[in-house]
Amino acid sequence: VTTRTPIDSSPFHDLLIVDIGGTVASAYAGKLYADYGARVVNLEPSEGFSTRHIAPLLDNGTSAIHAYLHANKQSVSCTDSVLTHPAILAADLVILDVSTLPTSLAVDDFDTNVCAISWYGLTGPYAGFRGSDASIHALTGLMHGIGHTDGPPIIPTGYQAQVIGGLSAFNGSVGFLLGHVLSGPERSGAFCLDASIWEANMCLTDIGAAMSFNNQPMPKRLGINRFAPTYPLGIWPCKDGWLGVTVLNPSQWAAFCQLLGLDDLAMESKYQSSMARLDDVGIIEPRILKALSEHSAKDLFYRGQGMRIPLARVPTMEELFTVDQYVER
């Protein structure tokens, strides 16, 4: 059963969030507020947010990524003082990115709640360093496990580090706003949340610190789309399209084998272990690929849903506007 929540019944419908950062990280934090019903206003400089120029660009020059990040938001051009703009004065929360903050402004200049996003945090030895998604991937150690076994690590493309940073900024600022509401009349003054993109991304590799502390060897790079301990894992071709597969526990493995008619693999006792399956990838994967090639991605996806298998159908550009889950969202 699916229901649509009216905007005035959404959890954040009475919040005004103002984004003056204009980066992927600040925009993603604002996007999550907008998704939950908040009124989000982009206070943009005369040249517009930097996200407006991120490729790919549509025929009319619009950035597809910008459109995704800023759906259901309002944009206002600010040519005068940011601090005295009516949106800032009325805001429940101002989201900013230190990397795009004008030199004439400081984080402490605002008299309202602030979520200050930065690459490395507002304090510490890296605070003044310039950052990038690639540098975050390198510093967290994420790149160590990506790439061919006999080659250099591969730098992930896209803006994954900033998206995770924006998600963390959203979670943290929601907590502060909730604390203000619960405190009632006794609440303290405005807060400033120091949201470090680097710190947020440590969630991906913090287990490595524990392994190092216990003198355990770091996992070796296993090759393209090989990440211990999960297998099968990857985006694979089907008869007519591609399917994302993430199978970990024994019940998922049994259901996946049933879906593809590979019952003998499901019955193999040692393959109840995901790591054992990964060790025998040379035996298992050719059979999986052959079975996938005999079915459509759409058919496998919907049948797999009913069997509680973690599958993701990869739509073509032509299908994006007709995929049911996207239409509903």
Q: Language-model features: where?
A:
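Glycine-rich beta-alpha junction loops
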Residues: 47, 119-121, 197-204, 240, ...
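N-terminal helix-loop segment corresponding to the beta1-alpha1 unit
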Residues: 1-188
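Conserved Rossmann-fold dehydrogenase catalytic segment
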Residues: 122, 150-159, 181-201, 217-228, ...
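Aromatic-enriched alpha-helical interface/lid elements that frame and gate functional surfaces
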Residues: 225-227, 231-307, 311
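Active-site-adjacent beta-strand anchor residues
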Residues: 19, 97, 198, 245-247
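A glycine-rich dinucleotide-binding beta-alpha-beta segment and adjacent secondary-structure elements
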Residues: 298, 305-329
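Oxidoreductase and adenylate-handling cofactor-binding alpha/beta cores
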Residues: 166-191, 207-216, 257-264
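Short, surface-exposed loop/helix-turn segments at secondary-structure junctions
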Residues: 53-57, 211-221, 269, 323-329
